């Protein structure tokens, strides 16, 4: 094994000390590598064995993926074998907050950090799937960041791009950044996240039919028309996350008319009086904070159902409506991997209201319901369950249903042993065995803390009395929980 400098040993320690189940590899005093193997009564040294360097590139890349981009690049000094491994990494993160500590630094060719980032991108030889650039306030032109965007999208064909303008304590003035026209519209770009920018016009995002995911967080525009034009230029969006603000109010609503949209998250809307949402495919609607009045939200989405509206618990309680589907969806992945985590951040809202629509006769939907509910480590304020009308053959799923609920009742709580909710509301309740089995699970496990409400008022009198009698038996199982029909 070759070493490029005397500091290689510390670099080795940093790279290899990852807690992976590999043998201990070290350097002896004579600088020759050996492997230490431990038996019951003694240690054996096997010299001149470089196990790490003998691993294939894909395994080495897994090791590098656990390091920051900066640390991964430093492994190039470990040996010849590691020299070019980093430039095959599929994900790079450039965080300039670590290197620029005052506003006198410029984001241009004279800045050594900016120059180094350019060199790293140019030297990358693999498929660069995604890239994150976090930069700080600067003086001077906009050329360097626009240059990186062109390099990543046009040359590297990067699919996922995240740009964040970070404000430090040394810079409290609002500064603007001018993206070049069409700079964010390259056909290779599938996902774009912008954080903390002033979007003067929609020109950087014209003709973005390629985009599937768009996140605009802490984005300011002069007026609502800028955002409407941006959204109109992205007809194929499947995930849309908005945290936006306008300098001035207008009577024009924010219009979201994306037919393929699967997930819509509204983190905040400031100086926006009305919202019009029209989409035929929406499965997940997450309202984290909304400032408009109830009558100023128009929602046309046939797949999304909820009865407890977003204003019942107040404007500061996040409400999520989720149509559980058996289809694989980018919306479900985004919710599980990103949005849920945002709701559990420190200082985030402690209370959440959740509405779900589910077919209990569909095994895939039930497992996905378990996944969604199982995410929550905090108690949910309200859970609304809307049972879908089931028109499928009952006999095909009967044995599966029985086994599922029996397992859940005895040894596998649904969704897990920690999930808690203050109040559960059940709609479109038909009185089926599956629905009563789910109710029994939630009651016996102590999942519901205060109330369980079942809507039966739409049923004929005879059926309503039958269901209410069955509910009364459930109430008899315990005394702490209130179970009522309405």
UniProtKB/Swiss-Prot annotation:
InterPro entries: F-box-like_dom_sf, F-box_AtFBL13-like, F-box_dom, F-box_plant. SMART domains: FBOX (SM00256). SUPFAM superfamilies: F-box domain, RNI-like. Pfam families: F-box. Residues 49-97 form the F-box domain. This is F-box protein At1g80960.
């Amino acid at each position: 094994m070759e070493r490029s400098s005397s500091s290689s040993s510390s670099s080795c320690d940093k790279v290899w000390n990852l807690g992976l189940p590999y043998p201990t590899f070290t350097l002896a005093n004579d600088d020759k590598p050996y492997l230490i193997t431990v038996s019951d009564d003694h240690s054996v040294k096997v010299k001149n064995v470089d196990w790490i360097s003998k691993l294939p590139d894909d395994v080495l890349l897994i090791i590098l993926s656990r390091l920051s981009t900066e640390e991964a690049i430093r492994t190039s000094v470990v040996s010849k074998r590691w020299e070019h491994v980093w430039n095959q990494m599929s994900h790079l993160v450039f965080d300039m907050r670590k290197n620029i500590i005052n506003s006198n630094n410029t984001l241009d060719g004279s800045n050594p950090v900016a120059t180094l980032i350019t060199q790293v991108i140019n030297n990358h030889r693999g498929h660069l799937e995604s890239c994150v650039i976090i930069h700080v306030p600067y003086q001077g032109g906009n050329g360097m960041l626009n240059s990186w965007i062109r390099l990543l999208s046009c040359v590297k064909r990067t699919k996922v791009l995240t740009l964040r303008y970070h404000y430090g304590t040394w810079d409290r003035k609002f500064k603007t950044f001018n993206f070049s026209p069409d700079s964010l519209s390259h056909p290779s770009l599938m996902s774009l996240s912008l954080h903390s920018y002033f979007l003067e016009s929609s020109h950087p995002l014209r003709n973005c039919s390629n985009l599937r995911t768009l996140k605009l967080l802490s984005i300011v525009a002069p007026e609502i028309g800028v955002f409407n034009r941006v959204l109109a230029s992205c007809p194929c969006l499947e995930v849309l996350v908005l945290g936006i603000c306008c300098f001035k109010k207008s009577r024009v609503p924010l219009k979201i008319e994306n037919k393929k949209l699967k997930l819509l998250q509204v983190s905040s809307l400031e100086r926006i009086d009305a919202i019009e949402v029209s989409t035929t495919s929406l499965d997940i609607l997450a309202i984290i904070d909304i400032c408009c009045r109830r009558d100023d939200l128009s929602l046309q989405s046939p797949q999304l159902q909820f009865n407890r509206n977003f204003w019942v618990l107040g404007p500061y309680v996040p409400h999520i409506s989720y149509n559980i589907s058996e289809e694989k969806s980018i919306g479900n992945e985004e919710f599980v991997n990103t949005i849920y985590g945002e709701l559990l951040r420190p200082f985030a809202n402690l209370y959440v209201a959740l509405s779900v629509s589910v077919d209990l006769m569909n095994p895939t939907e039930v497992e996905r319901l378990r996944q969604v509910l199982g995410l929550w480590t905090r108690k949910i304020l309200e859970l609304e369950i809307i049972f879908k009308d089931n028109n499928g053959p009952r006999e095909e799923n009967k044995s599966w249903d029985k086994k599922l609920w029996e397992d859940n009742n005895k040894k596998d709580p649904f969704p897990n042993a920690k999930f808690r909710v203050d109040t559960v509301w059940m709609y479109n309740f038909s009185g089926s065995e599956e629905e009563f089995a789910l109710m029994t699970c939630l009651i016996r496990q102590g999942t519901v803390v205060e109330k369980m409400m079942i809507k039966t008022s739409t049923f004929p009198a005879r059926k309503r009395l039958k269901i209410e009698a069955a509910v009364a038996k459930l109430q008899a199982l315990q005394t702490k929980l209130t179970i009522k029909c309405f």
